[in-house]
Swiss-Prot record:
PANTHER family assigned to the protein according to its UniProt record, in alphabetical order: OLFACTORY RECEPTOR
Biological classification of the source: Eukaryota, Metazoa, Chordata, Craniata, Vertebrata
Sites where a glycan is attached: 5
A biological-process GO annotation: G protein-coupled receptor signaling pathway
Taxonomic superkingdom: Eukaryota
Gene name tied to this protein: Or8g17
Cited function: Odorant receptor.
Tagged with keyword Glycoprotein: yes
GO CC annotations on file: membrane; plasma membrane
Protein name per UniProt: Olfactory receptor 8G17
Length: 306
């Protein structure tokens, strides 16, 4: 056999969510609607923050960065998935598949660390309010966001680099609605021990470190809030964190369920369902969560409309 995966497979076919013909149109309309809401919600949030001087704070700088990640993540995945609902075969070239995988990993990992950075920002704001401006300087915020993307790129480079060392000859049908890493590896006829090891290591790192950052930040936040004597003060402090906690819970539960399961016992159908949450649903929900439960965003939106 010739070496190099492009010598055996030049293109793949995505199986999509379901093969049932009666569900294709309803699912197409459903996910098209979700994608449009995602684009409008996240771009709207970015524009609102850019145009409202009232929101030019570190908290909303991170929120605009999260919205950008969600917009990109959804755009990387959803349009190609929609093709399957209107065409019998959803073909994707090998380079296009690897590119989709690369950007998917970049934005998925970046979102994980961005949520951690946002938790750290809330910790500083509530636990050290007098030092907040000096600690969360513009340089510090830019460095954190840059670090988030660097971590995403490093992780994606490791996975894509490992993909290039294996051959594909079992099948050209990816049992997923996008070029998911585990689904691609299931088509390999090479030894994928190294790939599985890299997945396990990076999954643990990208789950444990952000989770520890978030949990430790909120542990200190809760302690600080409990020291606040006034009920109004406690309520205000909790309200600034509730939206972030909701976003964190949805993202980590769905992502962890997918990638911390051993591949040998992993059900691809279950994987598709959990993947829908963090690749399609979460990017749509985040701007809704942060706008509906955030007084500052509501005020800025009201001022812009008026």
């Amino acid at each position: 056999m010739e070496k190099g995966n492009q010598s055996t497979v030049n293109k793949f076919f995505l199986s999509g969510l379901t093969e049932q013909p009666e569900l294709q149109l309803p699912l197409f309309l459903l996910f098209l609607g979700i994608y449009l809401l995602t684009v409008l919600g996240n771009l709207g949030m970015i524009i609102l923050i850019l145009l409202s001087s009232y929101l030019h704070t570190p908290m909303y700088f991170f929120l605009s960065s999260l919205s950008f990640i969600d917009f990109c993540q959804s755009t990387v995945i959803t349009p190609k998935m929609l093709v399957k609902f209107v065409r019998e075969k959803n073909e994707i070239s090998y380079p296009e598949c690897i590119t989709q995988l690369c950007f998917f990993v970049i934005f998925a990992v970046s979102e994980s660390y961005m949520l951690a950075a946002m938790a750290y920002d809330r910790y500083v704001a509530i636990c050290s309010p007098l030092l907040y401006s000096s600690i969360m300087s513009q340089h510090k915020c830019l460095s954190l966001v840059l670090g988030v993307y660097i971590l995403g790129i490093v992780c994606a480079s490791a996975h894509v680099g490992c993909i290039f060392r294996i051959d594909f000859c079992k099948s050209d049908l990816i049992n997923h609605y996008f070029c998911d890493l585990i689904s691609i590896l299931n088509l390999s006829c090479s030894n994928i021990f190294v790939n599985d090891l890299v997945i396990l290591i990076f999954s643990l790192i990208n789950t444990i470190f952000p989770t520890l950052t978030i949990l430790s930040s909120y542990a200190f936040i809760i302690i600080s809030i409990l020291r606040i004597k006034s009920t109004e003060g406690r309520s205000k402090a909790f309200s600034t964190c509730s939206s972030h906690i909701s976003a964190v819970a949805i993202f980590y539960i769905s992502a962890g369920f997918t990638y911390l399961n051993p591949s040998s016992s992993h059900s691809m159908d279950e994987g598709k369902v959990s993947s829908i949450f963090y690749t399609i649903i979460v990017p749509m929900l985040n701007p809704l969560i942060y706008s509906l439960r955030n007084k500052d965003v509501k005020i800025a939106l009201k001022k812009m409309i008026e």
